[in-house]
C-alpha cells in the first residue's frame, strides 16, 4: 500500500470518499481543478516513490520492446504529476533508443493551462481540447458562428508544433462522461478544418471513420 497515495473506499468503516494514506501527500504538479485533482479513481499510484518510478521505467522498456510500438498516447495527464512524465519520457527514449513521439490527453478548455503543461513537459504533444470545444459550439450554434475566429484560443494557434488536432474521441461520443459530440451535419467541415490545415498534427477518430454500428451513436463521416 505504500506505493499508493490513497483510495476511494474505507473497507474498515465501509465509507466511500477520497482517503489520503497516512504519511502521504497529494502531488502538487497536477491541475488545480477541485483544489487538487491528483486523485481520479481506484488506488492512486505514488509516482514520486523511487520504487514506483523504477518499476514504471522497467515496465515501459518491457512494453516498448515487447510490442514494438513506435509512439505513445498518455491518458489523464492532469491527474499525474507533470514532473513524472518530464523524467519518464526522455528516460524511456534513451533506454530503448527510439524516438517514441508522444501525445497526451490533458482535458482542459484553457489553452494557457495546456501551454503551462508543455512548458513543464516539453517532451510531449497534447490534444487540442480547446479546438474540440470550438468545433462543438459551432456544430450546435444553428449556423451562428464566426468561423474566422475558430482557431483563436486554441493550442494549434499557440503552439502548432505540439498540438494534435481532433474532432471527436472515445470520451466525447454520446453516453460518455465528457460527451460533447460534434453534430453530424458539421463533421465533414470540422474534419476539413483540421485535415487541410498546415499547422498541427491531425488525428481521426475510429468511430468517425467507420461509424459505431454496435450502438448506432455515430454514423461514418
Per-region residue spans from a language model:
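Active-site-proximal loop/turn and secondary-structure-junction residues that shape catalytic pockets
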Residues: 27-32, 41, 78, 108
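Active-site-proximal helices and loops of the catalytic beta/alpha 8
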Residues: 1-10, 58-221
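Active-site mouth loops of central-metabolism enzymes
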Residues: 42-55
Amino acid at each position: 500500500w505504500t506505493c499508493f497515495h490513497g483510495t476511494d473506499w474505507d473497507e474498515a468503516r465501509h465509507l466511500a470518499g477520497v482517503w489520503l494514506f497516512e504519511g502521504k501527500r497529494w502531488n502538487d504538479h497536477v491541475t488545480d481543478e477541485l483544489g487538487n485533482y491528483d486523485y481520479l479513481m481506484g488506488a492512486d499510484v505514488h509516482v514520486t516513490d523511487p520504487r514506483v518510478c523504477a518499476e514504471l521505467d522497467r515496465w515501459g522498456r518491457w512494453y516498448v520492446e515487447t510490442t514494438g510500438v513506435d509512439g505513445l498516447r498518455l491518458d489523464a495527464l492532469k491527474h499525474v504529476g507533470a514532473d513524472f512524465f518530464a523524467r519518464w519520457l526522455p528516460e524511456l527514449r534513451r533506454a530503448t533508443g527510439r524516438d517514441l513521439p508522444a501525445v497526451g490527453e490533458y482535458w482542459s478548455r484553457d489553452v494557457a493551462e495546456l501551454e503551462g503543461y508543455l512548458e513543464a513537459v516539453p517532451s510531449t504533444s497534447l490534444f487540442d481540447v480547446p479546438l474540440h470545444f470550438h468545433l462543438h459550439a459551432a456544430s450546435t450554434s444553428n449556423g451562428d458562428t464566426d468561423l474566422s475566429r475558430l482557431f483563436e484560443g486554441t493550442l494549434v494557434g499557440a503552439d502548432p508544433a505540439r498540438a494534435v488536432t481532433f474532432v471527436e474521441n472515445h470520451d466525447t461520443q454520446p453516453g460518455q462522461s465528457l460527451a460533447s459530440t460534434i453534430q453530424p451535419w458539421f463533421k465533414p467541415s470540422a474534419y476539413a478544418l483540421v485535415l487541410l490545415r498546415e499547422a498541427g498534427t491531425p488525428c481521426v477518430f475510429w468511430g468517425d471513420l467507420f461509424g459505431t454500428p454496435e450502438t448506432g451513436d455515430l454514423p461514418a463521416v
